[in-house]
């Protein structure tokens, strides 16, 4: 429970000069739950450490009136102002004395954000004092560094039970409809964990060995309580084995309908929120948390709330300890990751970096105190080792029982247990803000040695030195190797034994370290382009800042080959062409970096390639990825685009492939076409990004490619840019500023105003220029000679074949100019276009159909060259759009028949008209 609002109070610092020690309180309360009026008398036994002239208690709230004060049963003067009760003492008072303060009134609650003290509901009264709200309902020296015994005498209505610290010694019937409940503690208690609750309770008793467990619940809560607290005896035994024997005379719970906290660890008697009694042990972590406080917080208490993390770290960490014990180590690690580490990281993402030590008053009970500090304990356990860590946390209980501890004393105990200087560890985690990340470079040599370079990265000025466990593949121990990560980078060497591949190495698999992320510098194979008898590979530079000898490429032939290095020596380049491959085979590739000491990086990702033969035997292919718009000027329908390309291509013989209707293309399909015009005429839904490797392989194999469309350069990935456009930067002109495409070699191209939005004023938006390109076909004319004026607007790239990139969609240019441009550029790319195809010997095939024309069904007869040949039949519109594909197997005499009902592949009836049949047969 916390608030980021500015605190109106500061955490009080321990005052060693008070001159007195309160050894016992006797608190007598008469409570009227209807009027919320209380009568109280608090007796305090005080030992002066030197002669005192006065003593002060805190008692806040304007409606609480002090009636009388006695010192050693004699009336004494007093003042009660601004929440401080000041009592002058006889000048010669040097020995133990007793004060009695009589008071009455309606107690107030403490200010926001806590709003606690004595709390009344319709069916209960209870107290919450953490961090310093005892003073709002009884006069006390309300500071955690002065612990005292406490006896409670609580007078409430006769049908209620009252539960409190210590052992109940009796219940007195007052004969007036009330009873007084007497509770006596035998161990010193800090004021913030003194507390009681009263309600129409029933008692539910348990036993943990000789330890009595008293649970006070409402009758309707009993069944749920018996389930939710069923594991409490085992939990006490488990924590006793870890921390030391349970330290007090009893334990238990008192159920209350509180809304401030989930629960509160009052010494020997936890106050538990009714909302968290589910009957299915859903909130057992709260049970574990509050129980652990009996050792850390109650037996050993932070000297001030500046050190509040000392108690909440152990309680929160104990949630994980119990989960790991009860549900298994893996479940415990999941709990640690999700409910502690990630919970805190999410909180810090919203609230900013925080320091654990000395929080603001309003932030004492925020996640830095709980989840972050619990994470620190877990990392300390890793640093010290299991045996030393648990010895250390037991030493705290043994060294400071019944007393207080400071952060400095905690650190001193840890250093004694671990035998090392832990100043850096605690400086970065307790006294400084931030959560680090870390990056690791893992390398391995052929002699069975590994080298790990760890670098920590901090979002704040905190310099983090991290110990991070790793899991080595094949190791039986998950966290057997611990490496360091420092701001400047730290190198750790270790033997890998028989493990010859560290690819599956895991960084901190059991979540020991509170970190935003762990990353590894791994090689990234960015491109793997298969073409005719070769594979073109490209990769990104190795990110690690280490001296490199170069890069090595490894290849494996499927199905059962082994990876072998195909580069005779480390390469300095970021690409490699493997020409020692055969068409039709499938290969896998990865790349590694090699440093100057002979250590290899972990393998990159694996990519697959299958070189194939490029026959280029089927002429010009037009690929249409336009899905079709609304038919408005800037959103053309598919038919409008088809009509445009039918016009601008004129008499050029070509085949159409509609990606939206016919699906994805294969490299095998492209390998038959020496020229491809790929166009996209929509603002979005671009499909070219899924085909970059395909097109790259096509061009490298000698294919000729012309690309036209909106914004398609934005889809080019780094591998494509590096391979085909080195030194070229595509730059978008987002606004409607393109006036024309200008060229000395080709017809100028102007946007077609009829196809543009009126506000564009005849100018084209979202055009691209190619800064740095060396062979422009066109340059951009920009409105008012604005930015990117005269920059390359259409370029030619030579890479085995030729690629022509237009920084604009050809559809939106004037049709006549576009037609003239294509009439010139297409024969340059593919001189055979429009002439007879290559003369390729082929078997004699026969194809006939009847009736022709037909109304409902067409019988198609095919004659293959040989019996058993595979026969494919494709049906096209006159514009070359494939409507249907059929297949079958020829009979013994090579005959094969099909029937067509006039529907396309989607089952739609085709329009009346003339259709073309294409027959293909294997062999």
State the predicted function of each range.
Residues 839-850, 854-923:
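C-terminal outer-membrane/trafficking sorting elements
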